[in-house]
Swiss-Prot record:
Protein's pathway: tRNA modification; N(7)-methylguanine-tRNA biosynthesis
Encoding gene per record: trm82
An example Gene Ontology biological process: tRNA (guanine-N7)-methylation
Database matches in InterPro entries: Trm82, WD40/YVTN_repeat-like_dom_sf, WD40_repeat_dom_sf
Organism: Aspergillus oryzae (strain ATCC 42149 / RIB 40)
Compositional bias ranges of the Polar residues kind: 46-66
SUPFAM superfamilies the record matches: WD40 repeat-like
Keywords: Nucleus, Repeat, tRNA processing, WD repeat
Protein name in UniProt: tRNA (guanine-N(7)-)-methyltransferase non-catalytic subunit trm82
Length: 493
Protein backbone atom coordinates (compact mmCIF):
# COMPACT_ATOMS: atom_id res chain seq x y z
CA UNK A 1 0.00 0.00 0.00
CA UNK A 2 1.44 3.33 -1.08
CA UNK A 3 2.17 5.98 1.53
CA UNK A 4 0.11 9.14 1.63
CA UNK A 5 1.04 12.69 0.77
CA UNK A 6 -0.31 15.40 3.06
CA UNK A 7 -2.46 18.12 1.53
CA UNK A 8 -0.55 21.44 1.68
CA UNK A 9 -1.80 24.37 3.73
CA UNK A 10 -3.27 26.58 1.02
CA UNK A 11 -3.84 29.69 3.17
CA UNK A 12 -2.23 30.95 6.38
CA UNK A 13 -3.33 33.71 8.77
CA UNK A 14 -1.83 34.88 12.05
CA UNK A 15 -4.24 36.19 14.69
CA UNK A 16 -3.71 37.83 18.04
CA UNK A 17 -6.77 38.15 20.27
CA UNK A 18 -6.89 41.40 22.15
CA UNK A 19 -7.68 41.25 25.84
CA UNK A 20 -6.20 41.07 29.30
CA UNK A 21 -4.10 38.11 28.21
CA UNK A 22 -2.81 38.10 24.67
CA UNK A 23 -3.62 34.89 22.81
CA UNK A 24 -1.94 34.06 19.54
CA UNK A 25 -3.14 31.65 16.88
CA UNK A 26 -2.19 30.42 13.45
CA UNK A 27 -5.12 29.59 11.16
CA UNK A 28 -4.68 27.49 8.03
CA UNK A 29 -6.89 26.03 5.31
CA UNK A 30 -6.11 22.70 3.68
CA UNK A 31 -8.50 21.04 1.29
CA UNK A 32 -11.99 21.61 2.66
CA UNK A 33 -10.88 22.13 6.27
CA UNK A 34 -9.64 24.97 8.45
CA UNK A 35 -7.18 24.24 11.28
CA UNK A 36 -6.32 26.40 14.26
CA UNK A 37 -2.95 26.13 16.01
CA UNK A 38 -1.36 27.70 19.06
CA UNK A 39 1.19 30.14 17.63
CA UNK A 40 3.69 29.48 20.42
CA UNK A 41 3.75 25.68 20.27
CA UNK A 42 2.14 24.62 17.00
CA UNK A 43 -0.35 22.44 18.87
CA UNK A 44 -3.47 21.84 16.81
CA UNK A 45 -6.44 23.18 18.75
CA UNK A 46 -9.35 22.42 16.43
CA UNK A 47 -10.47 21.75 12.89
CA UNK A 48 -13.54 23.01 11.06
CA UNK A 49 -15.87 21.56 9.97
CA UNK A 50 -15.67 18.80 12.52
CA UNK A 51 -15.80 15.25 11.28
CA UNK A 52 -19.26 13.70 11.42
CA UNK A 53 -19.34 10.18 12.83
CA UNK A 54 -21.06 7.35 11.00
CA UNK A 55 -24.24 7.38 13.11
CA UNK A 56 -24.77 11.09 12.62
CA UNK A 57 -24.07 10.75 8.92
CA UNK A 58 -26.69 7.99 8.61
CA UNK A 59 -29.23 10.06 10.52
CA UNK A 60 -28.53 13.02 8.25
CA UNK A 61 -29.01 10.91 5.15
CA UNK A 62 -32.30 9.55 6.52
CA UNK A 63 -33.54 13.06 7.24
CA UNK A 64 -32.59 14.22 3.75
CA UNK A 65 -34.41 11.25 2.22
CA UNK A 66 -37.61 12.01 4.14
CA UNK A 67 -37.45 15.66 3.18
CA UNK A 68 -36.80 14.78 -0.43
CA UNK A 69 -39.83 12.46 -0.60
CA UNK A 70 -42.09 15.16 0.81
CA UNK A 71 -40.98 17.65 -1.79
CA UNK A 72 -41.06 15.09 -4.59
CA UNK A 73 -37.41 15.76 -5.34
CA UNK A 74 -34.40 13.44 -5.29
CA UNK A 75 -32.31 13.71 -2.10
CA UNK A 76 -29.16 14.75 -3.95
CA UNK A 77 -30.97 17.77 -5.37
CA UNK A 78 -31.66 19.02 -1.86
CA UNK A 79 -27.96 19.63 -1.27
CA UNK A 80 -27.74 22.37 -3.86
CA UNK A 81 -30.09 25.26 -3.10
CA UNK A 82 -29.89 28.67 -4.70
CA UNK A 83 -28.86 31.53 -2.41
CA UNK A 84 -32.16 33.33 -2.93
CA UNK A 85 -34.15 30.30 -1.75
CA UNK A 86 -31.92 29.32 1.12
CA UNK A 87 -30.86 32.71 2.44
CA UNK A 88 -28.04 33.14 4.94
CA UNK A 89 -27.64 30.07 7.06
CA UNK A 90 -26.77 31.52 10.43
CA UNK A 91 -25.93 28.91 13.00
CA UNK A 92 -23.92 28.58 16.17
CA UNK A 93 -23.04 24.98 15.39
CA UNK A 94 -19.42 24.36 14.59
CA UNK A 95 -20.19 21.01 13.01
CA UNK A 96 -21.29 21.19 9.39
CA UNK A 97 -23.50 18.28 8.35
CA UNK A 98 -22.01 17.72 4.93
CA UNK A 99 -19.29 19.69 3.19
CA UNK A 100 -20.22 20.67 -0.32
CA UNK A 101 -16.79 22.12 -1.01
CA UNK A 102 -13.34 20.66 -1.45
CA UNK A 103 -11.16 23.76 -1.10
CA UNK A 104 -10.99 27.03 0.83
CA UNK A 105 -8.94 29.37 -1.38
CA UNK A 106 -9.24 32.50 0.74
CA UNK A 107 -8.88 33.25 4.46
CA UNK A 108 -8.99 36.71 6.04
CA UNK A 109 -8.31 37.41 9.71
CA UNK A 110 -10.15 40.13 11.59
CA UNK A 111 -7.91 42.74 13.18
CA UNK A 112 -9.20 42.03 16.71
CA UNK A 113 -8.49 38.31 16.35
CA UNK A 114 -12.07 37.25 17.09
CA UNK A 115 -13.21 36.33 13.58
CA UNK A 116 -12.04 34.51 10.49
CA UNK A 117 -13.68 35.06 7.11
CA UNK A 118 -13.42 32.07 4.81
CA UNK A 119 -14.41 31.51 1.21
CA UNK A 120 -15.53 28.01 0.24
CA UNK A 121 -15.04 27.51 -3.47
CA UNK A 122 -17.64 25.20 -4.97
CA UNK A 123 -20.70 26.61 -3.15
CA UNK A 124 -19.50 30.24 -3.55
CA UNK A 125 -20.13 30.97 0.15
CA UNK A 126 -18.59 33.66 2.33
CA UNK A 127 -18.46 32.23 5.85
CA UNK A 128 -17.77 34.09 9.08
CA UNK A 129 -16.37 32.02 11.93
CA UNK A 130 -15.73 33.03 15.52
CA UNK A 131 -12.37 32.04 16.99
CA UNK A 132 -12.96 31.20 20.64
CA UNK A 133 -10.41 31.59 23.40
CA UNK A 134 -9.66 27.87 23.36
CA UNK A 135 -8.95 27.96 19.62
CA UNK A 136 -12.15 26.29 18.46
CA UNK A 137 -13.92 27.70 15.41
CA UNK A 138 -17.66 28.34 15.39
CA UNK A 139 -19.52 29.28 12.22
CA UNK A 140 -21.73 32.34 12.66
CA UNK A 141 -23.04 32.83 9.13
CA UNK A 142 -22.79 31.64 5.56
CA UNK A 143 -23.77 33.80 2.61
CA UNK A 144 -23.74 32.31 -0.86
CA UNK A 145 -22.90 34.78 -3.60
CA UNK A 146 -24.43 34.78 -7.10
CA UNK A 147 -21.03 34.38 -8.77
CA UNK A 148 -17.86 32.74 -7.53
CA UNK A 149 -15.91 35.16 -5.29
CA UNK A 150 -12.20 35.55 -5.92
CA UNK A 151 -11.07 38.08 -3.32
CA UNK A 152 -12.11 39.26 0.13
CA UNK A 153 -11.04 42.36 2.07
CA UNK A 154 -12.17 44.07 5.26
CA UNK A 155 -12.75 47.77 5.81
CA UNK A 156 -10.56 49.48 8.39
CA UNK A 157 -13.20 49.33 11.11
CA UNK A 158 -13.62 45.60 10.51
CA UNK A 159 -17.40 45.85 10.27
CA UNK A 160 -17.78 45.36 6.52
CA UNK A 161 -16.66 42.61 4.17
CA UNK A 162 -15.76 43.56 0.60
CA UNK A 163 -16.26 40.61 -1.71
CA UNK A 164 -15.14 40.65 -5.35
CA UNK A 165 -16.29 38.01 -7.79
CA UNK A 166 -14.89 36.75 -11.06
CA UNK A 167 -17.56 38.54 -13.07
CA UNK A 168 -16.16 41.91 -12.00
CA UNK A 169 -18.58 42.92 -9.24
CA UNK A 170 -17.67 44.02 -5.71
CA UNK A 171 -20.26 43.67 -2.94
CA UNK A 172 -20.25 44.94 0.62
CA UNK A 173 -21.64 42.69 3.36
CA UNK A 174 -21.89 43.34 7.10
CA UNK A 175 -19.43 41.24 9.04
CA UNK A 176 -22.19 40.11 11.40
CA UNK A 177 -25.73 40.04 9.99
CA UNK A 178 -28.34 41.79 12.12
CA UNK A 179 -30.84 40.02 14.32
CA UNK A 180 -33.79 41.24 12.30
CA UNK A 181 -34.72 38.94 9.39
CA UNK A 182 -33.80 40.41 6.05
CA UNK A 183 -36.65 40.67 3.57
CA UNK A 184 -35.31 40.45 0.04
CA UNK A 185 -37.14 42.57 -2.52
CA UNK A 186 -38.55 40.62 -5.42
CA UNK A 187 -37.70 42.25 -8.71
CA UNK A 188 -39.74 41.72 -11.86
CA UNK A 189 -37.84 39.80 -14.45
CA UNK A 190 -37.36 41.80 -17.64
CA UNK A 191 -38.18 39.51 -20.54
CA UNK A 192 -35.79 39.49 -23.45
CA UNK A 193 -37.88 39.99 -26.55
CA UNK A 194 -36.16 39.10 -29.83
CA UNK A 195 -35.75 42.01 -32.19
CA UNK A 196 -36.56 39.86 -35.22
CA UNK A 197 -40.14 39.33 -36.43
CA UNK A 198 -41.79 36.88 -38.87
CA UNK A 199 -41.60 39.68 -41.43
CA UNK A 200 -37.81 39.86 -41.24
CA UNK A 201 -37.10 36.12 -40.98
CA UNK A 202 -37.75 33.95 -44.01
CA UNK A 203 -36.01 30.58 -43.80
CA UNK A 204 -37.80 27.69 -42.10
CA UNK A 205 -34.98 27.09 -39.63
CA UNK A 206 -34.82 30.73 -38.57
CA UNK A 207 -38.59 30.89 -38.19
CA UNK A 208 -38.51 27.89 -35.86
CA UNK A 209 -35.74 29.51 -33.86
CA UNK A 210 -37.74 32.74 -33.59
CA UNK A 211 -40.83 30.88 -32.39
CA UNK A 212 -38.75 29.16 -29.72
CA UNK A 213 -37.34 32.49 -28.52
CA UNK A 214 -40.83 34.00 -28.33
CA UNK A 215 -42.13 31.06 -26.27
CA UNK A 216 -39.17 31.35 -23.92
CA UNK A 217 -39.67 35.09 -23.38
CA UNK A 218 -43.40 34.66 -22.69
CA UNK A 219 -42.70 31.92 -20.16
CA UNK A 220 -40.16 33.98 -18.24
CA UNK A 221 -42.14 37.24 -18.33
CA UNK A 222 -44.52 35.90 -15.66
CA UNK A 223 -41.73 34.81 -13.31
CA UNK A 224 -40.12 36.91 -10.62
CA UNK A 225 -36.42 37.14 -10.02
CA UNK A 226 -35.30 36.82 -6.41
CA UNK A 227 -32.42 38.93 -5.14
CA UNK A 228 -29.86 37.78 -2.56
CA UNK A 229 -31.65 36.96 0.65
CA UNK A 230 -29.23 38.77 2.96
CA UNK A 231 -28.11 42.33 3.50
CA UNK A 232 -25.71 43.44 0.78
CA UNK A 233 -24.83 46.30 -1.52
CA UNK A 234 -23.36 46.20 -5.00
CA UNK A 235 -20.55 48.76 -4.92
CA UNK A 236 -18.89 48.62 -8.32
CA UNK A 237 -18.34 46.51 -11.39
CA UNK A 238 -15.58 45.80 -13.89
CA UNK A 239 -16.20 44.85 -17.49
CA UNK A 240 -13.35 42.35 -17.10
CA UNK A 241 -12.71 39.42 -14.79
CA UNK A 242 -11.81 40.81 -11.36
CA UNK A 243 -8.72 39.40 -9.64
CA UNK A 244 -8.03 41.27 -6.39
CA UNK A 245 -9.51 43.83 -4.00
CA UNK A 246 -7.67 46.13 -1.57
CA UNK A 247 -8.99 48.72 0.88
CA UNK A 248 -7.13 51.72 2.25
CA UNK A 249 -7.86 54.83 4.31
CA UNK A 250 -5.57 57.85 4.03
CA UNK A 251 -5.69 61.36 5.52
CA UNK A 252 -6.39 64.19 3.13
CA UNK A 253 -3.75 66.86 2.66
CA UNK A 254 -5.88 69.73 3.85
CA UNK A 255 -6.32 71.85 6.94
CA UNK A 256 -8.97 69.56 8.39
CA UNK A 257 -7.02 66.33 8.05
CA UNK A 258 -10.15 64.58 6.83
CA UNK A 259 -9.73 60.88 6.17
CA UNK A 260 -10.97 59.28 2.99
CA UNK A 261 -11.27 55.61 2.07
CA UNK A 262 -10.76 53.91 -1.27
CA UNK A 263 -11.25 50.54 -2.91
CA UNK A 264 -8.55 49.41 -5.32
CA UNK A 265 -9.43 46.62 -7.73
CA UNK A 266 -7.37 44.75 -10.31
CA UNK A 267 -8.60 42.79 -13.30
CA UNK A 268 -7.56 40.52 -16.12
CA UNK A 269 -7.32 43.41 -18.59
CA UNK A 270 -4.26 44.96 -16.90
CA UNK A 271 -6.32 47.67 -15.15
CA UNK A 272 -6.13 48.87 -11.57
CA UNK A 273 -9.12 51.01 -10.65
CA UNK A 274 -9.26 53.43 -7.70
CA UNK A 275 -12.81 54.02 -6.42
CA UNK A 276 -14.01 56.14 -3.55
CA UNK A 277 -15.69 54.38 -0.63
CA UNK A 278 -18.57 54.16 0.10
CA UNK A 279 -19.46 56.17 -3.04
CA UNK A 280 -17.79 53.55 -5.20
CA UNK A 281 -19.44 54.88 -8.36
CA UNK A 282 -16.96 57.76 -8.10
CA UNK A 283 -13.80 56.64 -9.88
CA UNK A 284 -10.81 58.57 -8.59
CA UNK A 285 -8.53 57.24 -11.30
CA UNK A 286 -6.69 54.30 -12.80
CA UNK A 287 -3.20 52.90 -12.42
CA UNK A 288 -2.26 51.81 -15.93
CA UNK A 289 1.11 50.28 -16.70
CA UNK A 290 0.80 46.50 -16.67
CA UNK A 291 0.86 44.65 -19.98
CA UNK A 292 -0.59 41.40 -18.58
CA UNK A 293 -3.26 40.54 -16.04
CA UNK A 294 -3.03 41.83 -12.45
CA UNK A 295 -3.24 39.25 -9.66
CA UNK A 296 -2.12 41.00 -6.47
CA UNK A 297 -2.43 44.46 -4.95
CA UNK A 298 -0.49 45.28 -1.78
CA UNK A 299 -0.75 48.56 0.14
CA UNK A 300 1.64 48.52 3.13
CA UNK A 301 0.09 49.61 6.42
CA UNK A 302 3.27 51.51 7.22
CA UNK A 303 3.15 53.38 3.87
CA UNK A 304 -0.49 53.67 2.70
CA UNK A 305 0.42 56.10 -0.05
CA UNK A 306 2.21 53.39 -2.02
CA UNK A 307 0.85 50.44 -3.97
CA UNK A 308 2.84 47.40 -5.08
CA UNK A 309 1.17 45.41 -7.84
CA UNK A 310 2.06 42.28 -9.77
CA UNK A 311 0.53 39.70 -12.04
CA UNK A 312 1.41 38.13 -15.35
CA UNK A 313 4.30 40.50 -16.09
CA UNK A 314 7.89 39.63 -15.18
CA UNK A 315 8.11 42.72 -12.98
CA UNK A 316 6.44 44.51 -10.08
CA UNK A 317 5.19 48.07 -10.28
CA UNK A 318 5.43 50.49 -7.36
CA UNK A 319 2.85 53.28 -7.54
CA UNK A 320 1.92 56.57 -6.02
CA UNK A 321 -1.59 55.25 -6.50
CA UNK A 322 -3.46 58.47 -5.66
CA UNK A 323 -1.78 60.05 -8.69
CA UNK A 324 -1.74 56.95 -10.90
CA UNK A 325 2.01 57.44 -11.19
CA UNK A 326 4.60 54.66 -11.50
CA UNK A 327 7.56 55.13 -9.18
CA UNK A 328 9.54 52.02 -10.04
CA UNK A 329 9.53 48.95 -12.25
CA UNK A 330 11.12 46.05 -10.37
CA UNK A 331 12.26 42.97 -12.36
CA UNK A 332 11.36 39.60 -10.87
CA UNK A 333 13.51 37.35 -13.05
CA UNK A 334 16.79 37.61 -14.90
CA UNK A 335 15.98 38.07 -18.54
CA UNK A 336 18.78 35.83 -19.77
CA UNK A 337 17.63 32.90 -17.62
CA UNK A 338 13.90 33.26 -18.09
CA UNK A 339 12.37 30.04 -19.43
CA UNK A 340 8.76 30.19 -18.26
CA UNK A 341 6.05 32.78 -17.94
CA UNK A 342 5.85 34.57 -14.60
CA UNK A 343 2.76 34.86 -12.42
CA UNK A 344 2.79 36.67 -9.08
CA UNK A 345 1.07 34.55 -6.44
CA UNK A 346 1.32 36.81 -3.42
CA UNK A 347 2.72 40.10 -2.12
CA UNK A 348 3.09 40.75 1.62
CA UNK A 349 4.32 43.86 3.41
CA UNK A 350 5.56 43.98 6.99
CA UNK A 351 7.81 45.97 9.29
CA UNK A 352 10.39 43.79 11.09
CA UNK A 353 13.56 44.79 12.86
CA UNK A 354 13.30 48.40 11.80
CA UNK A 355 13.06 47.48 8.10
CA UNK A 356 10.01 47.89 5.88
CA UNK A 357 9.95 44.55 4.09
CA UNK A 358 8.06 43.38 1.02
CA UNK A 359 7.88 39.65 0.24
CA UNK A 360 6.87 38.27 -3.16
CA UNK A 361 6.00 34.72 -4.19
CA UNK A 362 5.72 33.51 -7.78
CA UNK A 363 3.41 30.72 -8.90
CA UNK A 364 5.32 27.43 -8.90
CA UNK A 365 8.50 28.88 -7.38
CA UNK A 366 10.33 27.81 -4.22
CA UNK A 367 12.00 31.21 -3.85
CA UNK A 368 10.44 33.84 -1.60
CA UNK A 369 11.77 37.12 -2.98
CA UNK A 370 12.61 39.85 -0.48
CA UNK A 371 12.77 43.63 -0.85
CA UNK A 372 13.18 46.61 1.44
CA UNK A 373 10.88 49.56 0.76
CA UNK A 374 12.64 52.89 1.05
CA UNK A 375 11.16 56.19 2.17
CA UNK A 376 11.08 57.33 -1.46
CA UNK A 377 8.87 54.39 -2.45
CA UNK A 378 11.54 52.33 -4.20
CA UNK A 379 12.19 48.65 -3.60
CA UNK A 380 15.74 47.46 -2.92
CA UNK A 381 16.18 43.73 -3.66
CA UNK A 382 17.61 41.43 -0.98
CA UNK A 383 18.72 37.80 -1.04
CA UNK A 384 15.72 35.48 -1.56
CA UNK A 385 14.73 32.71 0.86
CA UNK A 386 14.91 29.20 -0.61
CA UNK A 387 12.18 26.78 0.51
CA UNK A 388 11.90 23.01 0.28
CA UNK A 389 8.85 23.39 -1.97
CA UNK A 390 6.82 25.96 -3.86
CA UNK A 391 5.68 28.92 -1.76
CA UNK A 392 1.90 28.98 -1.21
CA UNK A 393 1.24 31.58 1.48
CA UNK A 394 2.96 33.63 4.18
CA UNK A 395 1.87 34.55 7.71
CA UNK A 396 3.79 37.26 9.53
CA UNK A 397 4.47 37.37 13.28
CA UNK A 398 5.95 40.84 13.64
CA UNK A 399 6.51 40.69 17.40
CA UNK A 400 8.78 37.69 16.92
CA UNK A 401 10.44 39.10 13.77
CA UNK A 402 9.32 35.83 12.20
CA UNK A 403 7.52 34.69 9.07
CA UNK A 404 5.74 31.35 8.64
CA UNK A 405 5.65 30.05 5.07
CA UNK A 406 3.30 27.40 3.71
CA UNK A 407 5.07 25.20 1.15
CA UNK A 408 3.89 22.62 -1.36
CA UNK A 409 5.04 19.25 -0.06
CA UNK A 410 3.53 17.24 -2.94
CA UNK A 411 4.90 18.70 -6.17
CA UNK A 412 8.49 19.02 -7.29
CA UNK A 413 10.16 22.35 -6.65
CA UNK A 414 9.53 24.72 -9.54
CA UNK A 415 6.68 22.64 -11.00
CA UNK A 416 2.92 23.13 -10.79
CA UNK A 417 2.00 19.65 -12.06
CA UNK A 418 4.83 17.14 -11.54
CA UNK A 419 4.43 15.18 -8.31
CA UNK A 420 7.30 13.90 -6.22
CA UNK A 421 8.16 10.23 -6.43
CA UNK A 422 7.26 9.56 -2.79
CA UNK A 423 6.16 11.52 0.29
CA UNK A 424 8.49 12.43 3.12
CA UNK A 425 7.74 11.79 6.77
CA UNK A 426 6.94 14.15 8.29
CA UNK A 427 5.80 16.39 5.44
CA UNK A 428 7.09 19.93 5.37
CA UNK A 429 3.78 21.79 5.53
CA UNK A 430 5.40 24.96 6.84
CA UNK A 431 8.82 26.51 7.27
CA UNK A 432 9.69 29.48 9.43
CA UNK A 433 12.39 32.14 9.28
CA UNK A 434 13.56 34.94 11.52
CA UNK A 435 15.42 38.14 10.66
CA UNK A 436 19.02 38.00 11.83
CA UNK A 437 19.69 40.89 14.19
CA UNK A 438 22.66 43.21 13.73
CA UNK A 439 23.18 42.60 10.00
CA UNK A 440 23.63 45.40 7.50
CA UNK A 441 21.53 43.76 4.79
CA UNK A 442 18.36 41.78 5.34
CA UNK A 443 19.29 38.21 6.27
CA UNK A 444 17.07 35.35 7.42
CA UNK A 445 17.79 32.31 9.55
CA UNK A 446 15.57 29.19 9.78
CA UNK A 447 13.48 28.62 12.88
CA UNK A 448 13.16 25.03 14.05
CA UNK A 449 11.08 25.54 17.16
CA UNK A 450 8.03 23.56 18.29
CA UNK A 451 5.68 25.61 16.09
CA UNK A 452 7.19 24.14 12.93
CA UNK A 453 7.83 20.66 14.32
CA UNK A 454 4.34 20.09 15.74
CA UNK A 455 2.45 21.40 12.72
CA UNK A 456 4.50 19.27 10.35
CA UNK A 457 4.18 16.21 12.58
CA UNK A 458 0.42 16.69 12.86
CA UNK A 459 -0.06 16.63 9.09
CA UNK A 460 -3.35 17.42 7.38
CA UNK A 461 -5.47 15.19 5.12
CA UNK A 462 -3.86 12.28 3.33
CA UNK A 463 -3.71 11.87 -0.45
CA UNK A 464 -2.54 8.52 -1.87
CA UNK A 465 0.82 8.73 -3.57
CA UNK A 466 -0.58 6.54 -6.36
CA UNK A 467 -3.51 8.88 -7.09
CA UNK A 468 -4.67 8.64 -10.69
CA UNK A 469 -4.06 11.28 -13.34
CA UNK A 470 -7.53 12.81 -13.04
CA UNK A 471 -7.28 13.28 -9.29
CA UNK A 472 -3.80 14.75 -9.59
CA UNK A 473 -4.98 17.26 -12.18
CA UNK A 474 -7.91 18.31 -9.99
CA UNK A 475 -5.59 18.87 -7.04
CA UNK A 476 -3.11 20.76 -9.21
CA UNK A 477 -5.87 23.07 -10.48
CA UNK A 478 -6.94 23.91 -6.93
CA UNK A 479 -3.53 25.34 -6.02
CA UNK A 480 -2.28 26.57 -9.38
CA UNK A 481 -4.95 28.32 -11.43
CA UNK A 482 -3.61 31.87 -11.80
CA UNK A 483 -1.88 31.03 -15.06
CA UNK A 484 -5.29 30.48 -16.64
CA UNK A 485 -5.77 34.25 -16.56
CA UNK A 486 -3.17 34.65 -19.28
CA UNK A 487 -4.78 35.43 -22.61
CA UNK A 488 -4.19 32.99 -25.39
CA UNK A 489 -2.63 34.05 -28.66
CA UNK A 490 -5.21 35.85 -30.74
CA UNK A 491 -7.63 36.41 -27.86
CA UNK A 492 -9.22 39.85 -27.90
CA UNK A 493 -7.82 42.32 -25.40
Amino acid sequence: MAANFQLPLQCLQYLEKRGAESQRFLIASSGGKIYSYAAETGQRLSSWPQDVDASNANNSKATETETGSEDQAPPEKKRKVSPSEEGPAETSKSTVKASTWSSIPCLVAHSNGDYVIALTAEDKCVRVLRLKDDGTLEQLSERCMPKRPCSIALTDDGNTILCGDKFGDVYSLPLLPGNEPYVAPKLPNRPKVPSATPLTVHSKRNLESLEQQLRYSQKNSTEEKNSLNFQHQLLLGHVSLLTDVAFVTVPQDDNFGKKRSYILTGDRDEHIRVSRYPQAHIIEGYCLGHTAFVTKLCIPQYAPGYLISGGGDDYLLVWKWSEGRILQKVPLVKQESETTQVTVRGIWATSIGGSNIVLVALEGSSNLQCFVLGSDGTLKPQDPIEMSGNVLDVAIMEKDSTIVVSVDCIREKGSTHEWRASPTSPSNLIESFRVKPGTENLEWEPVTESLVTNINMGGSSGIPADADTKQRKELNDVLYSLGNLRKKHGEDD
